[in-house]
């Protein structure tokens, strides 16, 4: 199982004066809970490494935001994170969509430095902990869940019973 997460693309305000440069923190927490399987591996197949070019507003993530997102993903139990792209392209429709390195293929971007810092930090933690192949018994014994269906949510959003309805706000 995997999901993609683009936190800063201009369509949400986040929290606080500069929240639009960090995104709404519940987006990662909800995705972790939604996609986490009872057994097996899951993670983020595409995590935004920097500015995108397809949003209504395309802000740079705040310094530290990419690293914050990575810690949030792993804190939710994910097993892996992949960045959307390694290198920012020279041309094309996503020419201004950042990668881990810039257009020259060598210069590390701010998001690339945050990936490197996170990798160093997670390696340091691995030396202080013992990996578990089996999930804890108390976790496996849980019997509570949120039943959610994207198609139902999309249908409700297109035909709201009132203009204030927000499915995600309801389940958060």
At which residue positions do the language-model features occur?
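Carbohydrate-binding surfaces of carbohydrate-active enzymes
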Residues: 3-172
């Amino acid at each position: 199982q995997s999901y993609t997460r683009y936190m800063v693309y201009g369509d949400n305000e986040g929290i606080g004066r500069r929240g639009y440069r960090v995104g709404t923190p519940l987006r990662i927490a909800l995705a972790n809970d939604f996609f986490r399987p009872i057994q097996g591996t899951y993670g983020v197949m595409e995590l935004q490494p920097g500015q995108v070019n397809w949003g209504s507003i395309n802000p740079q993530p705040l310094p530290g935001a990419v690293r914050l997102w990575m810690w949030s993903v792993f804190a939710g139990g994910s097993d892996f994170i992949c960045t959307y792209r390694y290198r920012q392209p020279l041309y094309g429709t996503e020419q201004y969509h950042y990668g881990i390195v810039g257009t020259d293929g060598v210069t590390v971007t701010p998001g690339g430095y945050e990936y490197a810092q996170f990798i160093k930090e997670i390696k340091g933690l691995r030396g202080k902990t013992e990996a578990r192949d089996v999930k804890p018994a108390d976790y496996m014994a849980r019997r509570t869940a949120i039943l959610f269906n994207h198609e139902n949510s999309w249908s409700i959003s297109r035909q709201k019973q009132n203009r204030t309805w927000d499915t995600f706000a309801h389940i958060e």
